[in-house]
Amino acid sequence: MNELDLNQYMDRVGRQARAASRAMARASTADKNRALLTIAAAIRRDADKLKAVNARDVERARANGQDAAFIDRLTLSDKAIATMAAGLGQIAALADPIGEISNMKFRPTGIQVGQMRVPLGVIGIIYESRPNVTIDAAALCLKSGNATILRGGSEAIESNTALAALVAEGLSAAGLPSEAVQVIETTDRAAVGRLITMTEYVDVIVPRGGKSLIARLMEEARVPMIKHLDGICHVYIDADADLDKAVRVCDNAKTQRYAPCNTMETLLVSQDIAAAALPPLCRIYQEKGVELRVCPATRATLEAAGFTGLVDAAEEDWRLEYLAPILAIKTVAGLDDAIAHINEYGSHHTDSIITENYSAGMRFIREVDSASVMINASTRFADGFEYGLGAEIGISNDKLHARGPVGLEGLTSLKYVVFGHGEIRT
């Protein structure tokens, strides 16, 4: 597709999305739920067809030398298809935030002022190899009354196109515009460049991908984004920590899964409890094959306890998101030092303190400048489902517009509404 054809194609997609967004904004909850449940039924009905289409994407990815982890993300297994269908039902069961009026108050002039929750409008979703994101993102945008333009990875183009056809079927069956969810059907990477600059059509971009994708979009996008670049998450073991809790939480925060953005990457330990806390915890880490990158004080503590195989932490280790069985460990003077380290080196994603000291815990959650802050809980809980949002479209570590896991409410905004009885301003 040449540049002229691409621009014309993207403009058409944008115009259709903008028109559809107006219809979606006034769609009833019943119609939106009907669409979601119809899509779920269509996915179950066409499961074998979806697997056949997906197999072609998988075969092509293997031929291109993609690794096993990539193939796993790309594959639509029976379980993945069932999960997609079930997820649609769960989103249909969520309360519809659109049209809610809150914060109503009477003014001395006689008017009544409040806020109404409304859709953002048109949301562009850019993601990589997971075809299930096509359904997850479409469902959240649909339920929140938005239109969406989906640009998945070229490796999943056939799977994404097939899923989009089922979404269009569900929208039409509910009397909603099929253009409310559109998948960009070209694999030309220039389509991403156009999508992120279409301020006349697109209200927000939500990228779901690796650091290189997010970094590129931060450089080039003109449309506002809901995103996070890194997940450099910390757990701090305070001097007043319960050791059993510390070991249990820190083990889970690092080793339950290594790849998610809410996995702990740096462990901070108060010098007053390091000799008691570090050996039992690091023994677990080494048994599980976790490489330990340590500061000098941590090395001294662990070597005194008989540990070997430690790696000296470099300055850059405090700023790294490993997404791997690697953990940076630093012994700190105390709470002040821990908070300062997190605010200096962290990515403002998720950080947790292990302590039995109420004042220390409250200081931590007040002063650590992150989207999620926790007391005596694993960073792995930083997730829309775990927070009771039902589902999430992503996690934001920005301060505007949404922060933390982004569910239905994160895909909406508030406008002021005023009720009067003929009042005039004097």
UniProtKB/Swiss-Prot annotation:
Catalytic activity: L-glutamate 5-semialdehyde + phosphate + NADP(+) = L-glutamyl 5-phosphate + NADPH + H(+)
Keyword field: Amino-acid biosynthesis, Cytoplasm, NADP, Oxidoreductase, Proline biosynthesis
Function: Catalyzes the NADPH-dependent reduction of L-glutamate 5-phosphate into L-glutamate 5-semialdehyde and phosphate. The product spontaneously undergoes cyclization to form 1-pyrroline-5-carboxylate.
Assigned EC number: 1.2.1.41
Annotated InterPro entries: Ald_DH/histidinol_DH, Ald_DH_C, Ald_DH_N, Aldehyde_DH_dom, G-glutamylP_reductase_CS, Glu-5-SA_DH, GPR_dom
Domain of life the protein comes from: Bacteria
One Pfam family in the UniProt entry: Aldedh
Gene Ontology cellular-component terms listed: cytoplasm
NCBIfam families given in the database record: PRK00197.1 (NF001221), proA (TIGR00407)
GO molecular function terms listed in the Swiss-Prot or TrEMBL record: glutamate-5-semialdehyde dehydrogenase activity; NADP binding
Family membership: Belongs to the gamma-glutamyl phosphate reductase family.
Pathway this chain belongs to: Amino-acid biosynthesis; L-proline biosynthesis; L-glutamate 5-semialdehyde from L-glutamate: step 2/2
Protein name: Gamma-glutamyl phosphate reductase
UniProt cross-references to HAMAP family, sorted A to Z: ProA (MF_00412)
Gene expressing this chain: proA
Biological processes annotated in GO: L-proline biosynthetic process
Keyword NADP: yes
Subcellular localization: Cytoplasm
Principal location: cytoplasm
